[in-house]
């Protein structure tokens, strides 16, 4: 009996499936504008708290991001990470960084080398960026976030890495962590750059994930970016428990997102905003050069975004009011029954 069983098991071919563990490139863009984080803290506390509370929330977000990057590196030895900060004066590569010389004694020397390199460089570069942000606050420079520019730089970095690794299959995805306020006026002027990022990410098959912290209004353009690239959009109240959101919703593999229910919140608003007034419009005027959407005809007969001149005949036709027959408006027939 044992001999029969041995021959049966020896003759049976086990169907072994080779699981392909493809390395992945994770690029994270973080909105580090101190002004935005201070505004968020004031809205949540309801008091005029100073910048220290905003910096505290930003540091809590940094801790979660570092753990998230280390977890991504732990999944596969071939995984790569990139961290970009969008601050008030532009964007900066926090990791990898060409001018970094890690010398942070607060990082344990017994840590895994891959984690230690990321932690040391990120903490050092973030410390330098904090000093620059505080100096910018004292000099009262522009406090607008450059989120769209950082997203463009992130996609440029992804494209370069994919070109360098053409022989090996490498997946890529982009995660955007932004701080939202109740106004969201700065996002209106980033509409065209964000649309360009959506087109580029779609062409590269790079999914865009978004985590918005705070704010009462959803980020319309970032929602459209996640929907167009099969990404995940999450709106959380604060930085508490951020690592739990990152380690669950943002770790879903892009190849599995078509067969599972993504943790997206609500429906996507596909309407756009007027470049001049900032109002959400469903019907408006569109520039044929840069696709800028306007709810009113701009003064000077030029596009406010790309400065392209408009045809005077078309402008006159658009400003012409509808003319009724015989020049007299028709009266409504009201019949009393």
UniProtKB/Swiss-Prot annotation:
Q: How does it assemble?
A: Component of the 7-subunit TFIIH core complex composed of XPB/SSL2, XPD/RAD3, SSL1, TFB1, TFB2, TFB4 and TFB5, which is active in NER. The core complex associates with the 3-subunit CTD-kinase module TFIIK composed of CCL1, KIN28 and TFB3 to form the 10-subunit holoenzyme (holo-TFIIH) active in transcription.
Q: What Gene Ontology molecular function terms does this protein carry? A: zinc ion binding
Which InterPro entries is this protein grouped with?
TFIIH_Tfb4/GTF2H3, vWFA_dom_sf
Q: What is this protein called?
A: General transcription and DNA repair factor IIH subunit TFB4
Query: Lineage of this protein's species?
Result: Eukaryota, Fungi, Dikarya, Ascomycota, Saccharomycotina
The record's subcellular location field reads: Nucleus
Q: What are the protein's UniProt keywords?
A: DNA damage, DNA repair, Metal-binding, Nucleus, Transcription, Transcription regulation, Zinc, Zinc-finger
SUPFAM superfamilies documented for this protein: vWA-like
Per the record, its GO cellular-component terms are:
transcription factor TFIIH core complex; transcription factor TFIIH holo complex
Main subcellular location of this protein, as a coarse class: nucleus
Question: What does this protein's UniProt record list under function?
Answer: Component of the general transcription and DNA repair factor IIH (TFIIH) core complex, which is involved in general and transcription-coupled nucleotide excision repair (NER) of damaged DNA and, when complexed to TFIIK, in RNA transcription by RNA polymerase II. In NER, TFIIH acts by opening DNA around the lesion to allow the excision of the damaged oligonucleotide and its replacement by a new DNA fragment. In transcription, TFIIH has an essential role in transcription initiation.
Instruction: Name the source organism.
Output: Kluyveromyces lactis (strain ATCC 8585 / CBS 2359 / DSM 70799 / NBRC 1267 / NRRL Y-1140 / WM37) (Yeast)
Annotated GO biological processes are: nucleotide-excision repair; regulation of DNA-templated transcription
The family assignment reads: Belongs to the TFB4 family.
Q: Where are the zinc fingers (C4-type)?
A: 287-306
């Amino acid at each position: 009996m044992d001999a029969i069983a041995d021959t049966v098991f020896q003759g049976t071919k086990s169907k072994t499936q080779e699981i392909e563990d493809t390395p992945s490139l994770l690029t994270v863009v973080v909105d580090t504008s101190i002004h935005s984080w201070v505004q968020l803290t004031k809205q949540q506390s309801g008091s005029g708290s100073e910048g220290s509370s905003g910096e505290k929330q930003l540091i809590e977000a940094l801790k979660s991001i570092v753990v998230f990057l280390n977890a991504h590196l732990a999944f596969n030895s071939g995984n790569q990470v990139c961290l970009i900060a969008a601050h008030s004066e532009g964007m900066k590569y926090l990791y990898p960084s060409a001018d970094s010389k890690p010398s942070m004694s607060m990082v344990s020397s017994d840590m895994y080398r891959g984690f230690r390199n990321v932690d040391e460089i990120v903490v050092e570069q973030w410390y330098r960026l904090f000093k620059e942000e505080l100096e910018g606050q004292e000099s009262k420079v522009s406090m607008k976030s450059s989120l769209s520019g950082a997203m463009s730089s992130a996609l440029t970095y992804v494209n370069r890495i994919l070109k360098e690794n053409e022989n090996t299959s490498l997946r890529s995805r982009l995660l955007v962590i932004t701080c939202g306020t109740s106004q969201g006026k700065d996002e209106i002027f980033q509409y065209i750059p964000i649309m360009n990022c959506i087109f580029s990410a779609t062409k590269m098959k790079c999914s865009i994930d978004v985590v918005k912290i705070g704010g009462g209004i959803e980020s319309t353009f970032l929602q459209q970016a996640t929907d167009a690239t099969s990404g995940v959009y999450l709106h959380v109240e604060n930085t508490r428990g951020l690592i739990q959101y990152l380690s669950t919703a943002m770790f879903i593999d892009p190849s599995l997102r078509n067969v599972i229910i993504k943790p997206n919140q609500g429906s996507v608003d596909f309407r756009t905003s007027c470049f001049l007034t900032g109002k959400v419009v469903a019907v408006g005027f569109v520039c044929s050069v840069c696709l800028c959407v306007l709810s009113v005809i701009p003064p000077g007969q030029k596009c406010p975004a790309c400065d392209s001149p408009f045809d005077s005949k078309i402008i006159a036709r658009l400003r012409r009011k509808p003319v009724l027959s015989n020049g007299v408006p028709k009266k409504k027939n009201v019949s009393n029954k």
